[in-house]
Amino acid sequence: DRSPSRGLGDVYKRQILDDEIPEVYSIEDHRLDEDTVSYLQGKYPHIETDIIENFPFETPRVGQLDIIQDINDAIRQGYKYIILEAGTGTGKSAIATTLAKMYGSAYILTMTKQLQAQYADEFDFPLVKGRQNFACLNDNLESTCDMGTCKTTPTSSNFFCPYGVAKNPTLDAELAFEDSYGGTVFYQSGQHCHYWNQKANAVNSPITLMNYDYGILELNYVKHFGTRSLLILDEAHNIENKLMKTMEVNLFNYRLEKDINKVISKETLKDGELKDWIMEIAAITESYEDIDIKDISKNKADRVRSTIGRLKSLKNNLEKEPKNWVIDADDTGVTFKPLKVHHYAANNLLKYGDVVIFMSATILSHKMFSKWLGLNPNEVYHIKVDSPFSKEKRPIILDLAGKMSANRIKDTAPKTIPILQKILEKHK
């Protein structure tokens, strides 16, 4: 129906009604049947039954079960960190799935939406998403949950959302989930907010799928998710850059002036030394702490609390490791960036798994990778597996169309179309 009377609300309604809320994952419902297990046991007598039962497919690829057995043996030997460097075609997602099911408690973090979709679609793992992905029931599905009434009204308004959650239950309240501290969170009614419903199911699932940005935020600040037996980090070669980005702090004068009616002095921006910046950060933090968050929107209150926490952490890091931080200032503001994350990786991410499994096709040097993340070499077990595809079957073919820089892309992009068509025709 393309009638002009159908507005934005209808778009959201169609989107959310078509979007299934992931159910709580059941490991028991995703084990292989007895006949398949018996067949695979006969074919792979050296592989433990637990591995075969939890493998997601009836036919393993060459070497997959042996890799899982190797990782499982390493965990039993007490290794805290497992680095699986496996080439394209190894089937790393099936390996991760089997181990997650075996240990019964795991997070799987991925970088790309494509890989998230693969895990969610192929293995039925619940993918937990942010508020912006769900339409607000209280707003008649005409806004997303990040802009719903519960996030845009101040605490002092005493707004009550019948679809949301609360720590203080009503008489007939249904338990939604327990947070990482053991605190209980309850639904307010029998009709559940889509955002909270999917999040509760993800918390209650033994295996949960997240992207890195959401996972780092949730685990460190929101605290609804606790530590699990396994933390499986896919595309792990990106972790150092991802942690650096999440630790980066930006302070812009236009934002400071709007929030706290203050700006960083021109003198500090131009010639500020470390001690000047530490004093500046302390003063800015105090000003944010003076904001009465009861009278501002919950979205802004969340941002203020987050800013205070990040500034305190930054001040502490600058005092402890001043040489590890780059201070990049201009006349509009300042950016603080860490040079290395080796002292922060464990506390900001790795501690949320009793055992951490890093997976990538491109680790290159596991010793340098371990050093960059501050891993104890005695706790690291490295497995390297070449791609099962021969070099002849994975050639690199250059077919250049031109430069793709911002000022050239308009000319170059059309030239790529026949090249892409040729590739698609060859492999259809």
Task: Give the ranges of each region predicted by the language model.
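Signature of the SF2 helicase/ATPase Hel1-core->accessory helical subdomain module
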Residues: 101-102, 117-122, 190-207, 211-295, ...
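Walker A/P-loop NTP-binding motif
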Residues: 70-74, 93-105
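Conserved strand-helix element at the start of the C-terminal RecA-like helicase core
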Residues: 106, 427-428
